[in-house]
């Protein structure tokens, strides 16, 4: 596990809140994502995944949401402040033999804060991204409560992983403007996964992809990687055309392999 003490404390605080609210329904909580793979970057979230054995009642959704709004930091994160938390809760029955796309019982992320502060409740969502999260989490997740990840997290068939990437592509590419760094790095990681079947960090995927790209597109992707690592300013004002060309190149590479 490569998270520092502050992030571990934040993950443990969130886990304690989840346990106190969901109580006997909670089977496990796992830490996954950057904290357990390549290390947390300046804007990385603390990614948590929980498994429950029964649907979450609205009253418990409200309590869990209130706790997460309090514990999670806001985006974009300032240096030294709490990190954003992303929590996905899955019903054990929904993932025992996963259908496509996988259904999440509850999702919290800072991109949804405005809606949640307007009193919207997290609701169950079926989304290709859920399938990809489970596939990657099974490979790397660390238990904060409950048994080893392979006890509950299913092995996602390769054809479902490929279908999830295919179905997630249009929305991902459409969100490029304003989220250039994340979209380009996610496309690079999709290319890597579609080519090899494995999951690696965004910065490692960018390095892998850039070595196989034309110089201009590679330079744009490297800029995204360096911004992700905190080495350069995350500024795309004068790189709109370059980011679009790079996204188009990466998208085509992914589609060729799916």
Where are these regions (language model features)?
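Helical scaffold of the NTase/Pol beta-like nucleotidyltransferase catalytic core
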Residues: 1-29, 59-65, 258
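A generic structural motif
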Residues: 2, 52-58, 175, 193-194
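Short secondary-structure boundary/capping segments within folded domains
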Residues: 18-23, 37-42, 77
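Catalytic metal-binding acidic patch
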Residues: 29-70, 74, 84-91
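Conserved NTP/Mg2+-binding pocket subregion across the NTase superfamily
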Residues: 66-177, 184
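Extended, basic/helix-rich recognition subdomains
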Residues: 166-223
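Structured mid-to-C-terminal alpha-helical surface segments
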Residues: 198-258
């Amino acid at each position: 596990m490569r998270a520092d003490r502050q992030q571990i404390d934040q993950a443990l605080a969130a886990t304690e809140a989840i346990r106190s609210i969901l109580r006997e329904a909670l089977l496990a909580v796992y830490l996954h994502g950057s904290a357990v793979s390549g290390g947390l970057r300046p804007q990385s979230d603390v990614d948590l995944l929980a498994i429950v054995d029964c649907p979450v009642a609205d009253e418990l959704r409200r309590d869990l949401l209130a706790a997460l709004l309090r514990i999670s930091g806001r985006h974009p994160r300032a240096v030294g402040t709490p990190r954003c938390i992303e929590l996905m809760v899955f019903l054990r029955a929904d993932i025992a033999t996963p259908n496509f796309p996988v259904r999440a019982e509850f999702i919290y992320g800072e991109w949804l804060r405005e809606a949640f502060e307007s009193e919207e409740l997290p609701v169950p969502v079926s989304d290709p991204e859920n399938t990809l999260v489970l596939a990657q989490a099974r490979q790397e997740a660390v238990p904060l409560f409950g048994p080893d990840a392979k006890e509950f997290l299913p092995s996602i068939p390769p054809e479902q992983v490929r279908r999830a990437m295919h179905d997630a592509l249009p929305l991902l590419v459409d969100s490029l403007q304003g989220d250039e760094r994340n979209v380009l790095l996610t496309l690079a990681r999709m290319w890597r996964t579609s080519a090899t079947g494995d999951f690696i960090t965004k910065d490692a995927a960018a390095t892998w992809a850039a070595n196989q790209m034309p110089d201009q597109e590679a330079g744009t992707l490297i800029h995204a990687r360096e911004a992700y690592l905190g080495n350069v300013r995350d500024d795309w004002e004068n790189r709109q055309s370059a980011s679009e060309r790079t996204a188009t190149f990466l998208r085509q590479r992914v589609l060729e392999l799916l």
